[in-house]
């Protein structure tokens, strides 16, 4: 199948839990990852710590997420593996092409993500209009910057 974009690699893995503090004990204290920033959004019901491993274009984020309000949606702590982020060389072309193939996206379209890159999300479940999905896994498509495109192409 000829597609007008490439998936270059993994940008992030987002892990949800009831407590970022408990998640940090494992990922920072035990595994040795470094916290590089944080992000909070009442609208997205998320309070997250952004960790990293690797360097330069090979850096991968591990996002530790807890809900701002566990009674509201989205429930960023359930499932525990919240989503996976993929570097894309041309996000706009990818969204256009995938939509034509019948892939369902979450509301909101392309927007700035927590790490400052343009992102959009493939819905974990299809529907009648857009039957293709990632079968239960939320997938974030992330516009790769030039250095990542060069290194991973």
Predicted regions and their residues:
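Conserved short beta-strand elements that form part of the metal-binding/catalytic scaffold
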Residues: 34-76, 115-145
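Conserved active-site tyrosine of GNAT-family acetyltransferases
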Residues: 23-28, 98
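Conserved acetyl-CoA-binding loop of GNAT-fold acetyltransferases
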Residues: 28-36, 102-104
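Vicinal oxygen chelate
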Residues: 1-4, 9-18, 49-54, 72-153
């Amino acid at each position: 199948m000829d597609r007008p974009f490439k998936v270059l690699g993994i940008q992030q893995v987002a892990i949800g839990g009831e407590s970022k503090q408990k998640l940090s004990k494992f990922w920072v204290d035990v595994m040795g990852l470094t916290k590089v920033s944080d992000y909070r959004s009442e609208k997205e019901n998320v309070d997250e710590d952004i960790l990293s491993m690797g360097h330069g274009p090979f850096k991968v984020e591990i996002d530790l997420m807890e809900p701002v309000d566990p009674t509201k949606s989205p429930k960023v702590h359930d499932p525990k593996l919240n989503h996976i982020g993929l570097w894309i060389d041309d996000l706009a072309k990818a969204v256009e092409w995938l939509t034509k193939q019948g892939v369902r996206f979450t509301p909101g379209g392309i927007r700035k993500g927590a790490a400052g890159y343009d992102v959009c999300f493939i819905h974990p479940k299809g529907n009648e209009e857009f039957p293709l999905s990632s079968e239960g896994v939320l997938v974030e498509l992330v516009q790769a910057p030039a250095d990542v495109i060069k290194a991973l192409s």
